[in-house]
Amino acid sequence: MYIVNSYTLAIIFCFITMICWGSWGNTQKLASKNWRYELYYWDYTIGILLFALLLVFTLGSFGDSGRGFLEDIQQVEAAYIASALIGGAIFNASNILLSASVSIAGMAVAFPLGVGLALVLGVFINYFSSPKGDPFWLFTGVVLIVIAIICNGIAAGKNQKAGTNNSKKGIILAAIAGILMSFFYRFVAAAMDLNNFESPTTGMATPYTAFFIFAIGIFLSNFLFNTLVMKRPFVGLPVTYKEYFTG
């Protein structure tokens, strides 16, 4: 599998991740004119699964380091598979709530509150469960990012049309989403040997395999979580699978 050994490249990948994490909500808003978020969310989860498949059969299978995907997936123990699946289910539940909040209260409210809570709580939870890195720079960075998110929310809020009221329901959903999202990574991390990517502990997953199992957890849990939201939406009338397939 391919392993990032360059610090500079790792930072670049982090920036790409941040851009993607902060941009997917825009696609939801663009689609919302004629595509309910409950239906959009199926596209979102299917996209994650397809990307995971592409990743494990390319970067996760090429190279001389570590275990290739097909070799690795066969030896992962059931407990670690379950852990990554649980992480996917938790992430999916939180993201559905965040999407609902975006559709109700708008991105200016949902993202600063939901993602901000997830970021702050997630750093504390994951750092104290597995302390790595310089805490000063880590928590300084967190504070700066949170300030940036808050400023972005304020700026976006001022840009809204006069008279727009943020729904209390949307704020509550964003807060619950943020709290849930802060817990998902520890379950995914528990499935991996984070100390040795080149020769991972037998029975544990490589990052590529863990991400693939995580994506399966998202997709499978969507049949429960999103079906419930489709039948009992937070706002608007129920939607059906027929509407999804007819477009």
Predicted stretch roles:
Residues 1-247:
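Polytopic alpha-helical membrane proteins, predominantly small-molecule transporters/carriers
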